[in-house]
Amino acid sequence: IENLGVTLVEHMPVNGLVLGENGVHGVLTEQGEFNAERVVIAGGAWSARLLESTGMTLPIRPVRGQMILYRAEPNVVQRIVLSRDRYVIPRRDGRILVGSTTEEVGFDKSTTPAAMQELESEACRLIPALAGYEIEHHWAGLRPGSPNGIPYILQHPRIEGLFINTGHFRNGVVLGLASARLLADMLLGQQPILDPTPYSG
């Protein structure tokens, strides 16, 4: 991507937008201003906060999901297991991911013993062999929830050059490629790969 003239700036929190009379001009960060003719708000659970300065209220809320990771040998679990909003995902190195909770607790990313116990119990119900393995890690993340579970993929209705791609909730990995392609078509002014109306809020 760098060969196309793109500069990647990682681990740089965006604190606000640079807005002018004729649209968006960039973003504000702790390291200063980054200028751009087009800006995409893809801030997950924080997207609504970034849009506040534009006068747009987007009903995106943080939904906490806690997960655990087992240390095991390869092939203890050989395929993904899905059951009642829970999943068990084997990794190539033998580690096994189990998730996840769905908690309406605002921007709180802390973990709880109750969630760990519930995930461990569910993991051992689905894969009894996991009872013999150690839980290596327990963490939480925040997902961007939308009222009807449908993401927002659109151009800002009033600000030229400002685009939005958020609200994928638990389906970010599943919907990511199609979502990015639809947004790319919008950014480039091309015929979209699918009707964007359902994602326009």
Each PLM stretch: what is its role?
Residues 1-7:
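N-terminal Rossmann-like dinucleotide/flavin-binding domain of flavoprotein oxidoreductases
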Residues 7-9, 136:
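General small-molecule cofactor/ligand-binding pocket signal
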Residues 10-25:
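A conserved short coil-to-beta-strand element within the FAD-binding core of flavoproteins
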Residues 12, 44-45, 177:
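Alpha-helix N-cap/helix-start capping motif
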Residues 22-27, 76-78:
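Short, hydrophobic/aromatic-rich segments at coil-to-beta transitions
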Residues 26-28, 97, 163-164:
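General beta-strand recognition
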Residues 33-34, 38-160:
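Active-site substrate-recognition segment that forms the wall
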Residues 127-201:
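C-terminal catalytic lobe of FAD-dependent flavoproteins
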